């Protein structure tokens, strides 16, 4: 698909910086640029060309570099030029105004990648992966998305498509040419093949559900009695005063949250209300929220006061009952002479021992997750569920009737949905919906 519209957009973040990149793609980019430069810009010759951007009065706007990508060897498959200018947004706005005046059009979100897909430069799976790569919350998701960008998901889906196509062809031979006995296939043979495909789809679906969880931050709940320094530890981990620190017991009445990055992974810390023991058993100062935080957390830090350390066995039993890994750490080591193992001083921000242990645990946690094949978008997961349901219906409907011309309709439906998943038979409404979620300039 070749568009007649020349689109441009800022591909870098819209604030003053060292430089900016303006992407410009379409059939007439050279013609338009030659109206606003003081040198002849041609499709031949150097891939990088230096020139001045000038206005109608030949007033200099900026000294720029043009990175030229000639069709079809460009990101969009069209002639594409990236204008590298100095990083003042005043300059960017002037250049964009000139492009607009000379025939360019502001690109919609994701329009460059949409053109790449429509021009056959990448598959729909790969195009979807581009946006997810930009938005990846941690290194593991980034690596998984890169597998899709490399085409591994397409290979899996192509195999499934070929298997379903083969099933449809075998059934159609039975329907259209019943006299050719040598070509007849037993229904039991078809069923076994369908069951194998269903199992493969189930694995992809289950993997994809895991990916949703991986987009959530790794949650750590800080648990302990009142005034053991939970809020101080939260502030030390975040390197900012997120929680109120006070000597008054029970100052934290609610769960205070904060996010930080640890070795490429997004961590959410939950500072909970102090848990106090009374005759009635464990009492939650923040009502039930502290214990809800334990249930939600991937890991618990059980914080004790090093000046009078005493573990609450009932609380530890609660961790184990909920199958929660937990670290026991002793805070306020600056107030004691004999140091405990796993001791810190949150107030003094002496928490290296804890951070090292967290880093090791989180690296091991994510290392256990296999970088398998995942569907990364909701629309993909909906389609693959439909494909699985059609194949299951193929097996289920045999209890009612065994007519091949009826049963094959379920395989044909699955066949069509696989084509949609591969982007080979997809409507423009879905395509537009997918790319509207992209950022500008991509």
Curated annotation (Swiss-Prot):
It comes from the Bacteria. Its cofactor is K(+). Binds 1 potassium ion per subunit. Keywords: Cytoplasm, GTP-binding, Hydrolase, Magnesium, Metal-binding, Nucleotide-binding, Potassium, tRNA processing. One of its GO terms (cellular component) is cytoplasm. The keyword Glycosyltransferase does not apply. Gene3D superfamilies: P-loop containing nucleotide triphosphate hydrolases, Probable tRNA modification gtpase trme, domain 1, tRNA modification GTPase MnmE domain 2. Its EC number is 3.6.-.-. (6S)-5-formyl-5,6,7,8-tetrahydrofolate binds at residues 23, 82, 121, 442. InterPro entries: G_TrmE, GTP-bd, GTP-bd_TrmE_N, GTPase_MnmE, MnmE_dom2, MnmE_helical, P-loop_NTPase, Small_GTP-bd. K(+) binds at residues 227, 246, 248, 251. Its main location: cytoplasm. Pfam families: MMR_HSR1 (PF01926), MnmE_helical (PF12631), TrmE_N (PF10396). NCBIfam families: mnmE_trmE_thdF, small_GTP. Belongs to the TRAFAC class TrmE-Era-EngA-EngB-Septin-like GTPase superfamily. TrmE GTPase family. Homodimer. Heterotetramer of two MnmE and two MnmG subunits. Exhibits a very high intrinsic GTPase hydrolysis rate. Involved in the addition of a carboxymethylaminomethyl (cmnm) group at the wobble position (U34) of certain tRNAs, forming tRNA-cmnm(5)s(2)U34. This is tRNA modification GTPase MnmE. It comes from Mycoplasma genitalium (strain ATCC 33530 / DSM 19775 / NCTC 10195 / G37) (Mycoplasmoides genitalium). The lineage of its organism: Bacteria, Bacillati, Mycoplasmatota, Mycoplasmoidales, Mycoplasmoidaceae.
């Amino acid at each position: 698909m070749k568009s007649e519209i020349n689109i441009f957009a800022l591909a870098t973040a819209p604030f003053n910086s060292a430089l900016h990149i303006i992407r410009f793609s379409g059939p007439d980019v050279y013609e338009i640029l030659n109206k606003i430069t003081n040198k002849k810009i041609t499709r031949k010759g150097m891939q990088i060309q230096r020139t001045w951007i000038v206005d109608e009065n030949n007033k200099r706007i900026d000294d720029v570099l043009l990175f030229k990508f000639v069709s079809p060897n460009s990101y969009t498959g069209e002639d594409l030029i990236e204008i590298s200018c100095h990083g003042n947004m005043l300059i960017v706005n002037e250049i964009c105004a000139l492009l607009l005046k000379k025939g360019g059009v502001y690109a919609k979100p994701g329009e460059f990648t949409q053109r790449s897909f429509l021009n056959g430069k990448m598959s729909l799976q790969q195009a979807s992966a581009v946006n997810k790569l930009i938005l990846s919350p941690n290194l593991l998701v980034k690596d998984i998305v890169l597998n899709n960008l490399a085409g591994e998901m397409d290979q899996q889906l192509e195999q499934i498509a070929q298997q379903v196509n083969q099933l449809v062809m075998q059934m159609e031979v039975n329907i259209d040419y019943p006299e050719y006995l040598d070509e007849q296939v037993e229904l039991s043979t078809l069923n076994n093949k369908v069951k194998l495909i269903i199992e493969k789809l189930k694995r992809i679906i289950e993997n994809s559900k895991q990916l949703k969880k991986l987009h959530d931050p790794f949650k750590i709940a800080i648990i302990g009695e009142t005034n053991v320094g939970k809020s101080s530890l939260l502030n030390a981990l975040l390197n900012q005063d997120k929680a109120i620190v006070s000597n008054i017991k029970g100052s934290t009445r609610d769960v205070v949250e904060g996010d930080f990055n640890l070795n490429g992974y997004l961590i959410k810390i939950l500072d909970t209300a102090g848990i106090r023991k009374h005759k009635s058993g464990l009492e939650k100062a923040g009502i039930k929220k502290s214990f809800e935080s334990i249930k939600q957390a991937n890991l618990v830090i059980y914080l004790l006061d090093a000046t009078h350390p005493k573990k609450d066995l009932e609380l530890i039993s609660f961790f184990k009952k909920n199958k929660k890994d937990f670290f026991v750490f002793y805070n306020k080591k600056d107030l004691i002479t004999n140091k405990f193992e796993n001791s810190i001083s949150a107030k003094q921000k002496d928490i290296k021992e804890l951070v090292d242990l967290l880093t090791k645990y989180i690296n091991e946690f994510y290392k256990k997750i296999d970088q398998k094949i995942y569907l990364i978008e909701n629309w993909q997961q909906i389609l693959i569920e439909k494909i699985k349901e059609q194949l299951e219906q193929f097996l289920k409907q045999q209890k009612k009737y065994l007519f091949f011309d009826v049963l094959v309709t379920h395989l044909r439906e699955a066949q069509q949905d696989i084509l949609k998943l591969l982007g080979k038979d997809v409507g423009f409404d879905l395509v537009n919906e997918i790319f509207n979620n992209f950022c500008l300039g991509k």
